[in-house]
Amino acid sequence: PLGVDYMLPPRAEVQRPWGAPDAYIRPSAPFPSAKSLGLAYTLLTPVMLACLLRLRSIWLRVALLIGMALSTVPAIATSNRGMFIGLGISAAYVLLRQFLAANWRAVGMGVAAIAAVIVALFASGTVDNILGRQDYSDSTGGRAALYRATWNATLESPIIGYGTPRMEPSIGVSMGTQGYLWTLMFCFGFVGLALFALFMMCTVASGARVKTASGYWLHSVPMACCVVFIFHSFDIAQLTILM
């Protein structure tokens, strides 16, 4: 049950889609699902990079680098597409800010690092694993159908919404899930969604004045959230991290 998973989260989310030769084992602890772990990793990685840039002790830097390197193993094993999209947005944003600041050394290092990560993802089979999972589980098509149903239902109660997610029998998933944007829109109407969008705009605008590398990484968190909240739910610790 979901309540038990919140209190005693499993170490991994085991998925057995119909027709798949083997089960997909996706690390999730200390969260109830691999998606929650992926989103937390998306939000906290830029924070750790900002912390790394501000540390003065070489030993603390080495310890943090080792910890971050080890954390990539379960993160990659989640095969979470949203996590890679969010981290890519953060990295691209920081690279753009460094480019606009004419910090060519940082730009060169950033391009090299991004290229190395892309090569590693293909070489490790991570990309093949993500694409292979889609052959047996059309989660993209299922989400699209759910989003259409959520939109149509919200149009019937656009001001105050429905208060809580509701099951869509034809899809088998509750409307108002699979993305915080849809949760806000379905549960609290377009008014609730507009208020959260205003909060995000103010957060992005207030952080645009940063001029340091660590500041760029911290500011990349709300920038990435402007996209990942479309398909990720900020329902556990993620919203606290953002705020």
Language model feature labels by segment:
Residues 1, 78, 95-136, 151-156:
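A membrane-periplasm/extracellular boundary helix in multi-pass inner-membrane enzymes
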Residues 32, 38, 184-196:
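Membrane-interface anchor segments at the N-terminal boundary of transmembrane helices
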